[in-house]
């Protein structure tokens, strides 16, 4: 943590093709070893597959998928009186998008299709239909928060 003041968040530039900051953030999550061109080509190919399979605008399908993946509640561990409690807290908007993108990419990587663009496209389509592993992860997180609702009064 810095000793001198607060570190400001740097804003990402909007994507040149879809003019969306969310798409740029997805490219950044896809990127491995700084290979941005490779990550963006994977994403654009995935969006083409999404358009072919659904017949809808890929950005709309992606935003729908993100709305279905982003968590509203999560649990955070807090030590009270010698024991750890899982306390449900609301997720801040910035963290919601970060978690949604992280889960979407990580569960796309775990899929069994041949290429990464196919995996990502199918995960986006599944998430927009409220199915798929990323949506299941969100449901698990919400279920944990619901199960620990008794500790909500501790607050973080």
Swiss-Prot record:
**One term under GO cellular component:** small ribosomal subunit
Q: Which Gene3D superfamilies match?
A: Ribosomal protein S7 domain
Query: Is this entry keyworded Ligase?
Result: no
Known function: One of the primary rRNA binding proteins, it binds directly to 16S rRNA where it nucleates assembly of the head domain of the 30S subunit. Is located at the subunit interface close to the decoding center, probably blocks exit of the E-site tRNA.
Oligomeric and partner information = Part of the 30S ribosomal subunit. Contacts proteins S9 and S11.
Listed NCBIfam families: rpsG_bact
Listed name of the protein: Small ribosomal subunit protein uS7
| Source organism (scientific name) | Lactobacillus acidophilus (strain ATCC 700396 / NCK56 / N2 / NCFM)
